[in-house]
From Swiss-Prot:
Keywords: Conjugation, Plasmid, Signal. Belongs to the TrbG/VirB9 family. The keyword Signal applies. Coiled coil: none annotated. Residues 1-34 form the signal peptide. The keyword Signal applies. It holds the Pfam family CagX. The lineage of its organism: Bacteria, Pseudomonadati, Pseudomonadota, Alphaproteobacteria, Hyphomicrobiales. This is Conjugal transfer protein TrbG. Disulfide bonds: none annotated. CDD domains: VirB9_CagX_TrbG (cd06911). InterPro entries: Conjugal_tfr_TrbG/VirB9/CagX (IPR010258), TrbG_Ti (IPR014142), VirB9/CagX/TrbG_C (IPR033645), VirB9/CagX/TrbG_C_sf (IPR038161).
Length: 284
C-alpha cells in the first residue's frame, strides 16, 4: 500500500469518526412553530383545521353536470378558470346575509337570483382574474354558513356547483316513513297513496313538526310526541301577504287544519323567546 492510499484511508476514518460523534439534528415542526410564537394548542388547532380542509369528501354528479358536495363534511374546493364562470348554487329559499372573500382584488363574486315555485334560489357567480390563485370564501345565509376554498386553473374549471344537505336526506326518509304509516293515522280516511307529502318545513324550534301532509281537504301537522300535554304553537296561514287564523284542532300530537294550506307559520312565545316554523307546499 503506497503513501497516497494510506492518507485516503486515514481521511475516511476521521470523517466516519466525526459523523459518529456529532449527532444528526432533526428539526421538530413544533419547535419551529414555537419559534414563530405559536402555542401547542394553536398548533393543534391549525393541524385539525388543515386536516378538515384537506380531507377527501363525497363528490357526486348532479343534474345538468352539476358537481355536488355534501354540506358540512369537508371544506369544498371549487376550481375556476380565467375567462370562465363558476356557478355555485345555494339551497332554494336561502337568503344570503354576507359574502366574504379573502382575495377581493383578484376574485370577483356576484350573487344572482333565480325564481322558484316556492321562492328563489341564490347563485354565486365566481370569476378569477388569473390562474394559480388560492383563497377562501365564507357565505352566511338565513340557514347556514358555507366555508369554501377557491382555486384558479389555467384551463380547467367547475361550471356548476351545488350541495346535498343531510337534513334533506332525513326529511326524505321521514316522508317515506310517513307514506308507509299514513294509513294507520286516525282521521285521514284516505289511502296513503292519495295523500300529498310535498311540504317543506323550515325552523329550529324544539316542537318543530316531524311531517306535514294533506288529503286535499285538510292538512295534518304532526309534532313530536313530547308536545302532548303542552301548549301547542299558534297556526297562521299566509294568504295575500297577510297572516290569518283558520280553524284547527289538536288530537294528541297531531294538528288537524280544516283547510288545504299552501303556506303557514307556526308561532310560539313572545319577544326574544318567540320561535317560528314555516310550512310551505311544493318544497323550499
Amino acid at each position: 500500500m503506497n503513501i497516497r492510499h494510506r492518507r485516503q484511508r486515514a481521511t475516511l476514518a476521521i470523517g466516519l469518526l466525526v459523523f459518529a460523534i456529532v449527532p444528526l439534528t432533526v428539526l421538530d415542526p413544533r419547535t419551529a412553530l414555537a419559534a414563530d410564537g405559536v402555542t401547542a394548542n394553536e398548533a393543534k388547532g391549525m393541524g385539525l383545521s388543515t386536516q378538515w380542509r384537506g380531507s377527501k369528501g363525497l363528490v357526486t354528479k348532479g343534474a345538468d353536470g352539476k358537481v355536488i358536495f355534501l354540506y358540512g363534511e369537508v371544506q369544498p374546493s371549487v376550481v375556476c378558470s380565467p375567462l370562465q364562470v363558476c356557478d355555485i348554487e345555494l339551497q332554494g329559499g336561502e337568503v344570503v346575509r354576507d359574502v366574504l372573500v379573502g382575495d377581493t382584488v383578484r376574485w370577483k363574486v356576484e350573487p344572482r337570483h333565480r325564481a322558484l315555485a316556492g321562492g328563489q334560489a341564490i347563485h354565486l357567480i365566481v370569476k378569477p382574474s388569473e390562474p394559480g390563485l388560492v383563497t377562501s370564501m365564507v357565505v352566511t345565509t338565513s340557514r347556514r354558513t358555507y366555508h369554501i376554498q377557491l382555486k384558479s386553473h389555467p384551463t380547467q374549471y367547475m361550471a356548476r356547483v351545488g350541495f346535498e344537505y343531510p337534513e334533506d336526506v332525513s326529511t326524505k326518509l321521514a316522508d317515506v316513513n310517513a307514506r308507509l304509516e299514513a294509513s294507520t293515522i286516525p282521521g285521514t280516511g284516505v289511502p296513503a297513496e292519495q295523500l300529498s307529502f310535498s311540504y317543506s318545513i323550515s325552523g329550529s324550534a324544539g316542537w318543530r313538526p316531524t311531517r306535514v301532509y294533506s288529503d286535499g281537504l285538510k292538512t295534518y301537522i304532526q309534532f313530536p310526541r313530547s308536545i302532548s300535554g303542552q301548549d301547542a304553537p299558534v297556526l297562521f296561514v299566509v294568504s295575500g301577504g297577510q297572516n290569518r287564523i283558520v280553524n284547527y284542532r289538536m288530537k294528541s300530537n297531531m294538528m288537524v287544519v280544516d283547510y288545504n294550506i299552501d303556506r303557514a307559520v307556526l308561532v310560539s312565545g313572545v319577544g326574544w323567546k318567540q320561535q317560528k316554523v314555516t310550512i310551505s307546499r311544493g318544497g323550499r
